[in-house]
A protein has these predicted regions:
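Intrinsically disordered, low-complexity segments enriched in small/polar residues
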Residues: 371-505
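Extended recognition/assembly regions associated with phosphoester-bond processing machinery
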Residues: 1-370
């Protein structure tokens, strides 16, 4: 039964120059082994989704024009050519290969993607930035850079849609261009093949502490200083024009304030902006963004790439988040990093991670991968949110939000309407401990088509106060990893709170 979707991201195919993360002499055999695994399982695989950063336009030194898509294909014929590994997958799956853009390939176009073809005259399909296999709304696939401050498309500068992360990656590439020994490439070094090309922990920490000044100033100056790269050097862009880091700093000077504004402004906007910065820094809060997206779009599973860190699930959530990992760890990092991909069973939405493993001189083989789970909070177990499902599937009336109250916390997802025959999830999250000692507590009022009002109240305290659940004719509740209690029973302790209210009018 062909019910499985394979998700592969972050290959970073480029021109195989010394500053390219992907080196075909190292990574190609692993990638081809994955493609052959897909071909050999074509009786059960319905589709291969290439989930962003498949090619890479970012890892060129300052004085080099980034490679074109055509040039990358020419440099990687055994992968992308008409008789290459991807072409074999195209023919085995009857053309069911779909390309979703990431950040390092955000300039890829539909004509670029569809130019990849097979001897069977199948072409890769282009899905833009967001994709649901088989138009199944339960599943959302996107690269994930959209949730990160330094790598999300930025439409506010003259370099749009390039984010500041593009220039950070160019800084690192220029540094290695100057410092690699003859015949050496970055895949031989530790801590390479990562979203921005280096371990920039201290620099990002400084940037995120500088909320009242330009994060771009701190970030660019800090990384350029660390890498000893002059900010006056010309940077050659893909159209042949040039810029400098001085100009880049000025263009992105409002980066943090822009993130605050587009996420609601004030304290709540600042919280989202900080999460977006931390998501780039150490992949934290990617689970938070995945859950927010799932609730907003009524999805059950979100699969992303971008972080280069495989994730097998989401702790204490009504939905699931999986990260497929990446395909270009450096040789020095292969003892701790792995070349991985995800497989979704579309009937159950169970998602399994696999990785390509090479032992000695043997060809790489494919094996299941055990990976950590993510959390929506930075300290697992410290989520004091209320997750509230209002089940309107048995009702003949639509519901419209007419009011809400907040004692503690803030709404991350608050549907303004719930159609008859559907359900919706509300998310009330507690503020971070440094801002509030309380958990979350609030209420909402919805009105149906007949003018009847329904109030739902809920609370998940941090201190020794009672958990609250009330409203509707029937509800069921639980906390944490506990079991759902009998109808209309309120948990005595635990966190976070999950409650499902059922309407039957």
């Amino acid at each position: 039964m062909k019910n499985k979707v394979v998700v592969l991201s972050d290959i970073h195919l480029s021109d195989n120059s010394p500053t390219s993360w992907y080196q075909k002499g190292i990574h190609q055999e692993y990638l081809l082994a994955i493609f052959e695994w897909v071909v050999s399982h074509s009786d059960e695989v319905s589709e291969l989704v290439l989930l962003g950063d498949i090619v890479d336009f970012w890892t060129s030194p300052f004085d080099v024009v980034p490679p074109t898509f055509r040039h990358i294909v020419e440099q990687n014929e055994l992968v992308l050519g008409p008789d290459g590994g991807l072409a074999r997958v195209l023919d085995a799956l009857d053309g069911a290969v779909t390309y979703v853009r990431g950040n390092h390939d955000m300039m890829v176009t539909e004509p670029d993607v569809t130019s990849i073809s097979s001897s069977g005259d199948h072409h890769v399909k282009f899905a833009g930035d967001l994709y649901s296999p088989g138009n199944d709304p339960r599943v959302l696939l996107r690269h994930g850079n959209e949730y990160t401050m330094f790598n999300a498309p930025d439409l506010t500068t003259k370099f749009a849609p390039l984010p500041i992360g593009y220039f950070i990656t160019r800084i690192v590439a220029d540094y290695w261009h100057q410092h690699l020994a003859p015949g050496q490439n970055v895949s031989e070094l530790e801590d390479q093949g990562y979203p921005n090309g280096l371990n920039w922990k201290s620099v990002v920490e400084d940037a995120l502490r500088s909320l009242e000044i330009s994060i771009a100033d701190v970030l660019i100056s800090g990384i350029a200083g660390k890498e000893d790269v002059a900010q006056t050097l010309p940077i050659t862009l893909d159209d042949g024009s040039t810029t400098t880091l001085i100009e880049v700093r000025a263009e992105y000077r409002h980066l943090f304030t822009h993130w605050v504004e587009v996420n609601g402004g004030g304290e709540e906007g600042a919280l989202v902006a900080v999460k977006a910065g931390l998501a780039d820094y150490n992949s934290s809060f990617m689970g938070w963004f995945a859950q927010r997206q799932a609730f907003a779009d009524h999805a059950q599973l979100v699969v992303m790439g971008h972080t280069h860190a495989p994730i097998s699930g989401l702790a204490e959530s009504l939905v699931n988040y999986v990260n497929s990992g990446f395909e270009c760890p450096s040789v020095a990092d292969l003892k701790t990093k792995t070349i991985s991909f995800a497989v979704i069973a579309m009937d159950s939405l169970e998602t399994t991670l696999f990785h390509a493993v090479k032992v000695g001189a043997e060809a790489p083989s494919i094996h299941p991968l055990v990976a950590p789970v993510a959390s929506v909070v930075d300290v697992p177990g410290k989520d004091y949110s209320c997750y509230v499902v209002i089940d309107n599937t048995e009702s003949s009336s639509d519901l419209t939000l007419i009011g809400h109250g907040l004692e503690h916390g803030h709404f991350i997802n608050l549907p303004v309407s719930i159609r008859s025959g559907t359900s919706a999830t509300l998310w009330l999250q507690d503020f971070p401990h440094v801002l509030s000692m309380h958990g979350s507590q609030g209420s909402v009022v919805y009105r149906d088509d007949r003018g009847r009002d329904y109030e739902f109240a809920f609370g998940c305290p941090k201190e020794r106060h009672h958990i609250q659940c009330s409203g509707a004719t029937t509800f069921r509740a639980k906390t944490g990893y506990g079991e759902w209690l009998a109808p209309n029973q309120v948990p005595s302790t635990g966190n976070p709170l999950f409650v499902m209210f059922t309407l039957t009018t």
